[in-house]
Each structure stands twice: as C-alpha cells, then as structure tokens.
A protein has these predicted regions:
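A structural motif detector for short, solvent-exposed N-terminal "entry" segments of globular domains
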Residues: 2-78, 125-129, 145-158
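Hydrophobic beta-strand signal
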Residues: 67, 84, 105-107
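Acidic glycine-/aspartate-rich tracts in secreted/extracellular proteins
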Residues: 72-74, 109-112, 139-143
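Short acidic, flexible loop segments centered on an aromatic residue
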Residues: 73-89
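Intrinsically disordered, low-complexity Pro/Gly/Ser/Thr-rich segments with frequent PxxP/GP/PP motifs
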Residues: 88-121
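Local beta-strand/beta-hairpin segments that build beta-sheet-rich folds
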Residues: 90, 143-145
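Short, surface-exposed ligand- or partner-binding patches at beta-edge/loop junctions that are enriched
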Residues: 118-138
Length: 158
C-alpha cells in the first residue's frame, strides 16, 4: 500500500468520523435551543386569602402576601422591579438585595421592611381571594414570572 493511499484512507476515516459526530451532536444542540429556562427570581408562593375573617385589619392584610425567591447563588438587586395584580395595583421594590437562594414575602399591609419581609403599606387588600394574577417584572419592565389562581388560572397556594 502506498503512502498516498494510506493518507487518503486516514483522511476518509476522519471525514466519516466527523460526519458521525456532528450528526450525533446536532439533535442535542437542537433540543437545547427550544428549552425554556426557569426564572432566576420567581414567585414561589402566594397567600391571597388571609386566614380568618377578612376584617381589613393590618394583621389580616399582612397575612396576605406573595413570596419571591432567588433561585441562584448570587444576590439580585430588586430595585425598580414591580409586583402587580390583575387590576393594575403595583408595588415597586426599593433598593432591596435578595441574597442567593433566599426568599422575601411581600405583605399587603403596613410594617417595617426586613430581609425576610417587605410591606406595601396599603390600607386595603390587594389580592382577590377567588381569582387574580401576580406578575413580577424586572427593572426593564419584562415579565420575570407570573402566578394565577381561580377563574382562568390554575395556581392556588395557601
């Protein structure tokens, strides 16, 4: 067998192997393209119906909350982010840093903000007990996550 024949045979084997590898790799890349990533900051729970009587007391309003969770290892600044209900009532986050793998509850009533609890300082309920939608948007007004419950929604987390 001549040297040029051996070189051609090696080249043909390399081309064939490359074609097989690219054929195998293509479906994996194509499948990855359609995959939707989970939000890095998400609405992890909603308690729209405060326990007990709805007497519009501050205690009752603060038992109505939306829990926001940072699923990453890195802190996220929520400054300028918004949490909104279906009627358009909006809470705007101030300079709030949410540590990695931590959560904060956004309560409806009046209170003093802490790392674990934020307060909208409202005098009336925000979330409809029977059907509503909580929408979390980032500081570029892009929807990051949303949860619906009741008519037209499937989420009910009490």
């Amino acid at each position: 067998m001549s040297a040029s024949s051996t070189a051609r045979r090696i080249a043909a084997t390399a081309v064939t192997a490359g074609a097989v590898i690219s054929t195998v790799a293509l479906p994996a890349a194509a499948a990855d393209h359609g995959h939707h990533r989970q939000p890095q900051v998400a609405i992890s729970a909603v308690q729209a119906d405060s326990p007990g009587r709805d007497d519009n007391s501050n205690r009752s309003r603060n038992a109505e909350w939306v829990k926001i969770t940072n699923t990453t290892r890195h802190s996220v600044n929520l400054k300028g982010w918004t949490l909104r209900n279906r009627d358009g009532q909006t809470y705007r986050f101030r300079n709030v840093w949410l540590a990695g793998r931590s959560s904060v509850k956004v309560h409806t009533g009046v209170g003093h903000d802490t790392r674990a609890d934020l307060y909208q300082d409202r005098r009336h309920y925000v979330w409809d007990n029977h059907a509503d939608k909580a929408v979390l948007r980032n500081d570029h007004n892009r929807t990051v996550d949303a949860k619906s419950w009741g008519r037209g929604g499937h989420h009910h987390n009490h």
